[in-house]
């Protein structure tokens, strides 16, 4: 991984989401070597994924380079890789680009969509946790709206312009509002 040996204790943080970068920033006040690892070289500002999905923002507007988070701090490093295994016995991680020993390990890899055991929703729903997923949703929305404009059948138009949202948390509510706004402003 090309991380220099150091007399400092090494903290390895797996995950560059909110928890991972918040911890990395807080550790700047301590005398430690910090290695931030993520499978992407950017942090996704997830509260605005609905804006990407509805075309309000471009993906680059909610992606922040992880290297900038730790830039300028001595003994702070970022590595773009996927962790394949954690060897707690030997205090090391095994990744696609090599092994790395740690004194402290923090796993901050975020959350997964919980379907609460509903297999039907799990099979048919589109999650919105990442930028690529938001872009896929945007493509579907725009394709449906374009087909609706061309349709002469009112029932078909209605079906193409309506979506089922599962989840009424902040993201679901924001997405519902943005979809209603799109439908009203763009297609009327």
Name each region found by the language model.
Residues 1-9, 76-164, 182:
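FAD-binding core/adjacent interface of flavoenzyme oxidoreductases
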Residues 2-76, 161-164, 170-188:
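Beta1-alpha1 glycine-rich phosphate/pyrophosphate-binding loop at the start
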């Amino acid at each position: 991984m090309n991380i220099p040996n150091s007399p400092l204790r090494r903290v390895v943080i797996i995950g560059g989401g909110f928890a991972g970068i918040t911890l990395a920033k807080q550790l700047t006040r301590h005398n430690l070597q910090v290695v931030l690892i993520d499978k992407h070289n950017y942090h996704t500002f997830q509260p605005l994924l609905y804006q990407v999905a509805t075309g309000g923002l471009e993906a680059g507007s909610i992606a922040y380079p992880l290297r900038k988070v730790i830039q300028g701090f001595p003994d702070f490093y970022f590595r773009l890789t996927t962790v394949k295994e954690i060897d707690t016995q030997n205090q090391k991680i095994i990744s696609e680009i090599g092994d790395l020993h740690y004194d402290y390990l923090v796993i901050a890899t975020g959350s997964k969509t919980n379907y609460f055991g509903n297999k039907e929703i799990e099979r048919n729903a589109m999650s919105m946790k990442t930028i690529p997923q938001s872009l896929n949703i945007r493509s579907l929305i725009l394709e449906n709206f374009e087909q609706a404009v061309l349709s002469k059948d009112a029932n078909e138009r209605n079906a193409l312009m309506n979506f089922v949202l599962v989840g009424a948390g902040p993201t679901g509510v924001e997405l519902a509002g943005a979809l209603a706004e799109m439908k009203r402003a763009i297609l009327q």
